[in-house]
């Protein structure tokens, strides 16, 4: 009687899980491509882990919290590691809708990949498109980064304006002193005329030096 029950269950499972069956998915793994010399052999233990990960994913779907490992069926396993699987509903003895299984796999694809040290390219659910991992939120909000950059630009601009003002003031203060130095040099300039040192022109007084007056000009009274 037990043997009859076993064969009956096996026949039902074989009918539910077969290539191209309704709600069945094909999986292909490229373990050696991903891991090279560290590749592991695909055996019944790895199959058990796969069933556990699928059951784990299904338990996160509403109203599927009772899914067990035994509800996940594998068939047509090949040495190049490809197989088909379905998830059954034991209460009604049929497979769960493909939409529910697909949604569960997509939500937990990264967890399944990590369990086998693979990625979306080396662990493929052929009828389930791979999804990108959700973007990680930065530890610092974007608006704070933008505000910091703008604040730094403003500080640098203010510093440049202050330094420019100081430089211009120093330049203005330096110009009068240079003019005074030029006048002093002109006052102290001495020329030699016929062997007699004399000032050619009194710059500040505005009168002609006596050394340049002719003999008649000296004798003629003003």
Curated annotation (Swiss-Prot):
Pfam families: Collectrin
GO BP annotations listed: calcium-ion regulated exocytosis; insulin secretion involved in cellular response to glucose stimulus; positive regulation of amino acid transport; positive regulation of L-proline import across plasma membrane; SNARE complex assembly
GO CC term (a single one): extracellular exosome
Modified residues (Phosphothreonine): 214, 220
Keyword Lipoprotein applies: no
Stretches that traverse the bilayer: 142-162
Sugar-bearing residue positions: 76, 93
PANTHER family cross-referenced by the UniProt entry: COLLECTRIN
Subunit structure of this chain's protein: Monomer. Homodimer; dimerization prevents CLTRN cleavage by BACE2. Interacts with SLC6A18; this interaction regulates the trafficking of SLC6A18 to the cell membrane and its amino acid transporter activity. Interacts with SLC6A19; this interaction regulates the trafficking of SLC6A19 to the cell membrane and its amino acid transporter activity. Interacts with SNAPIN.
Protein name: Collectrin
Organism lineage string: Eukaryota, Metazoa, Chordata, Craniata, Vertebrata
């Amino acid at each position: 009687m037990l043997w009859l029950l076993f064969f009956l269950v096996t026949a039902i499972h074989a009918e539910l899980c077969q290539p191209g069956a309704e709600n069945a998915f094909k999986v292909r793994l490229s373990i050696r491509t991903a891991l090279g010399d560290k590749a592991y052999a695909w055996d019944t233990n790895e199959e058990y882990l796969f069933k556990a990960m699928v059951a784990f994913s299904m338990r996160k779907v509403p109203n599927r919290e009772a899914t067990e490992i035994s509800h996940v069926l594998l068939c047509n396993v090949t040495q190049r590691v490809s197989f088909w699987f379905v998830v059954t509903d034991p209460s009604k003895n049929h497979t769960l809708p493909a939409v529910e299984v697909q949604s569960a796999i997509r939500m937990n694809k990264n967890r399944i990949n990590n369990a086998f040290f693979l990625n979306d390219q080396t662990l493929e659910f052929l009828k389930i498109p791979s999804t990108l991992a959700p973007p990680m939120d930065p530890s610092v909000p974007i608006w704070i980064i933008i505000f910091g950059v703008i604040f730094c630009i403003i500080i640098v601009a203010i510093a440049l304006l202050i330094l420019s003002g100081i430089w211009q003031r120093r330049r203005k203060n330096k110009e009068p002193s240079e003019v005074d130095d030029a006048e002093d040099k002109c006052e102290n300039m001495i020329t030699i005329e016929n062997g007699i040192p004399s000032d050619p022109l009194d710059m500040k007084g505005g009168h002609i030096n006596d050394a340049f007056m002719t003999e008649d000009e000296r004798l003629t009274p003003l």
